[in-house]
Amino acid sequence: MAKQLQARRLDGIDYNPWVEFVKLASEHDVVNLGQGFPDFPPPDFAVEAFQHAVSGDFMLNQYTKTFGYPPLTKILASFFGELLGQEIDPLRNVLVTVGGYGALFTAFQALVDEGDEVIIIEPFFDCYEPMTMMAGGRPVFVSLKPGPIQNGELGSSSNWQLDPMELAGKFTSRTKALVLNTPNNPLGKVFSREELELVASLCQQHDVVCITDEVYQWMVYDGHQHISIASLPGMWERTLTIGSAGKTFSATGWKVGWVLGPDHIMKHLRTVHQNSVFHCPTQSQAAVAESFEREQLLFRQPSSYFVQFPQAMQRCRDHMIRSLQSVGLKPIIPQGSYFLITDISDFKRKMPDLPGAVDEPYDRRFVKWMIKNKGLVAIPVSIFYSVPHQKHFDHYIRFCFVKDEATLQAMDEKLRKWKVEL
């Protein structure tokens, strides 16, 4: 056709590095520690809840309420209302979406207008930038910077900090929203109360909405505490809090997410939702509702999944850290999430000339080399940065440690072979 087919809002966002690395991994005998999903079953109670939804009330095969299956919106309002210290109305303050991804897209489409600026904290979950651009907005980036590490010690995600003056300087009269991700993907940083108070004060000062992606909120380790910024004084009325049943119950294929927020903002998300997705799968929502009802009864008790799961994943994290160190990698200990990043600076010094395009960031060339030669899949951390900042953070790669014991043992075998070759 002579006419340009694609909308201009798609310019510059058509390349997806995930496709390249997934394809490369499929061509080799590898242990895939790249993509963020568990390779073990969801908890029994969640599977049983889905079975109840499929085999029970036949009306669960039909549409439910556009903005969420009523038992699900009710339990989300009750559960998170207590956590956030808010009276949450299931009809006005809760929207069920097609996963956390759908929640993010709906939020950007509802709030971001042509020329609006959106502050994104780096490293960032890679969809934030294209979603901002598709809505007509301009992403504005501010980076977490790693602090010094004592000789012989491992770094921690808690040492990566925002510069308060730099962050404040990113706000302008065009700033519409700030995107916060805690625990952070890929870094695993859990923002402290002091850090959240800084963000909150700037959002209030400049009348900016905070879109907070908290899909990993139950995966917090070493006694750290997840704090929702919406629970801070003056923030509920300007915050959209996004969650994911896939991450919460280790069932990423269910694709149920949600947004919590004040009605004066949520009404605009409902407009986008009803004119795009319209409705989310009823049976998945019913299973999530039953699972949350169970967890509410057991909340903070030793038998709660929200207590047991992070304990198990901390053991997986520690296993991976020990194993990666055996070949000279230097993990940054994450406070939360599915992921850890590891410093490959020593390899960059020893093997500076890995194959690849001249302008290709080193971490991408290293991951390709590792897939082909060592049989391990990771994700280059530079893809979680804006293009101008990628060259400053091309000496880190990301691993997912939320994996079955058999997968971690297979990783160990690959690393043993690697160690012999050193």
From Swiss-Prot:
It catalyses: L-kynurenine + 2-oxoglutarate = kynurenate + L-glutamate + H2O; 3-phenylpyruvate + L-glutamine = 2-oxoglutaramate + L-phenylalanine; an S-substituted L-cysteine + H2O = a thiol + pyruvate + NH4(+). Pfam families: Aminotran_1_2. The keyword Membrane does not apply. CDD domains: AAT_like. GO terms for biological process: biosynthetic process; kynurenine metabolic process; L-kynurenine catabolic process; response to bacterium. It is found in: Cytoplasm, Cytosol. Belongs to the class-I pyridoxal-phosphate-dependent aminotransferase family. Homodimer. This is Kynurenine--oxoglutarate transaminase 1. The gene is KYAT1.
